Design a protein with these regions (language model features):
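Membrane-proximal intracellular helices of multi-pass ion channels
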Residues: 1-479
Length: 479
């Protein structure tokens, strides 16, 4: 274990978080907020600067990062950023509990959008902005963001980025990894700006459009108001948000093909076609199922398309009370919670590509039992998928199911009903946000459950393994 490089890079990342807090500080100045808010932000910046400078005083002799160090850096960074990112809420007295603040910012950085707040009105503009700003930074990945702006290009960035970017296969769009991070972030931020401008043109205030765009771009779903998108009573805004979140659930590497004018490669992608097919089929089924509630096709389509888009992308914006929908529609949405968006997107969940691979493995196993002598291979985008990747997906599925079941078991100790407990486990681990049931706030859970769900959100965002390393004694050994 190269502990010195872990300490050095974590310290650098804490300095970056301190710098990011300048943004909500500016928002506090714009809205003339009270001294307590300024003190809370500046106090947190001071703590981060102290720890960051202390950790970078002694440079490591060996800059090489191996797989274990890469995964450990990623896990520690997300936990520490969530903890320190929550301190302004605690110091300002707007979320007095440290555990609640950790939960809220874990939800922010992991782009989950789950909240312990029953009323967003308790937050000042600056801290409301800070928790949504976490969506924007966490959407493409905290470490991808850091890699895009850091000058250091030593060995090992591949291990760090591979540990953070979701999906079974990690690929670079260009030869240099730093350039890959920069290209992805330029595409991401450009789409975010376009999204925010369109929302503003649709009638939102500048502040609301930025907050909503950050929630949509990061597929997190934090909103300005308690009733989320329903607050605006605008079909135009509803459809802009629906399509916008759907586009952020697409693999960002595919957008690079568009920049290269390789449109054919974009539309030939098998995961993309499956992703849109799932959206279309799910929307159609729900329209048929809820038509009796709304009694017209326009409203049935609007609500169905919006909820399918916001759930499969794991955004979690709200428009209507889906608990009043028939059980069949709720079941479809629960299934979409588990599937999630595309690999390489800002969306969470199991990922469409993994679901495709599992389905194809199941098909091949069925065919093998019928035709024992037939040689079967698994193809994705016209290429044979190697056995190692297939096995890694199956192993991930096993761990994924085990963690979901464990979460449901632990959360059931709070004596909530089964639908709430199951959706809480699925919602936090898949980084979705909303609860299915009688409550849409996680304040109903005990502090221990909220702490566990905070770590579950990070585990889900990092796809389990990096966070698990933190709790293995062997991780901290010198060998």
């Amino acid at each position: 274990m190269n502990r010195s490089i872990v300490r050095f890079l974590i310290a650098k990342l804490l300095l970056i978080e301190a710098a990011l807090l300048v943004v909500p500080l500016i928002v506090a100045l714009i809205y003339h907020e009270d001294a307590k808010v300024f003190a809370s932000i500046l106090g947190t910046m001071g703590i981060l600067l102290f720890l960051g400078v202390l950790g970078t005083l002694f440079k490591p002799k060996n800059y090489h990062i191996y797989t274990k160090e890469g995964m450990l850096i990623v896990a520690l960074c997300w936990v520490l950023w969530s903890f320190f990112g929550g301190l302004p809420f605690v110091f300002a007295g707007q979320i007095p509990s440290v555990i609640d603040a950790f939960f809220e910012m874990s939800s922010g950085f992991t782009t989950t959008g789950a909240t312990i707040l029953t009323d967003t009105g308790v937050l000042t503009h600056s801290l409301l902005f800070w928790r949504s700003f976490a969506h924007l930074i966490g959407g493409m990945g905290v470490l991808v963001f850091a890699l895009a702006i850091m000058n250091n290009s030593k060995n090992g960035h591949h291990e760090v980025m591979r540990a953070e970017v979701p999906g079974p296969v990690f690929g670079k769009v260009v030869a240099k990894l730093k350039n890959t991070a920069q290209i992805l972030y330029i595409i991401y931020l450009t789409m975010f700006v376009i999204f925010a401008v369109i929302l503003w043109l649709c009638g939102m205030s500048i502040f609301d459009s930025i907050i909503t765009a950050m929630g949509g771009a990061g597929t997190g779903g934090f909103a300005v108001y308690n009733d989320s998108i329903a607050h605006y009573h605008s079909d135009l805004i509803t459809y802009v948000v629906t399509v916008g979140t759907l586009l952020f659930g697409v693999n960002f590497n595919l957008y690079f093909y568009i920049l290269l004018r390789k449109i054919k490669f974009f539309f030939q992608d098998e995961e993309l076609r499956t992703y849109f097919a799932i959206v279309a089929i799910s929307t159609g089924l729900i329209i048929l199922n809820i038509f009796g509630i709304y009694h017209n096709l326009a409203d049935s389509f609007k609500y169905s398309f919006f909820e399918v888009s916001t759930i499969i992308t794991t955004t979690g914006f709200g428009l209507t009370d889906i608990t009043k929908w028939p059980l069949f529609s709720q079941y479809i949405l629960l299934l979409l919670m588990f599937i999630g968006g595309s690999a390489g997107s800002t969306a969470g969940g199991f990922k469409v590509i993994r679901a495709m691979i599992i389905a194809k493995i199941a098909r091949n196993q069925t065919l093998a039992s019928l035709y024992p002598n037939r040689i079967l291979s698994l193809h994705i985008n016209g290429s044979v998928l190697d056995k190692e990747t297939q096995h890694s997906v199956l192993k991930y599925l096993a761990v994924y199911v085990l963690i979901i079941l464990s979460l449901v078991t632990v959360l059931s100790l709070d004596n909530q009903d089964l639908l709430i407990v199951t959706s809480a486990a699925a919602s936090t681990f898949n980084n979705i946000g909303p609860l299915l049931g009688t409550s849409d706030s996680f304040a109903i859970f005990s502090p221990l459950s909220k702490l566990i769900m905070g770590f579950a959100m990070i585990a889900g965002r990092l796809e389990i393994y990096p966070l698990l390393l933190l709790f293995l004694p062997k991780t901290w050994s010198k060998t």
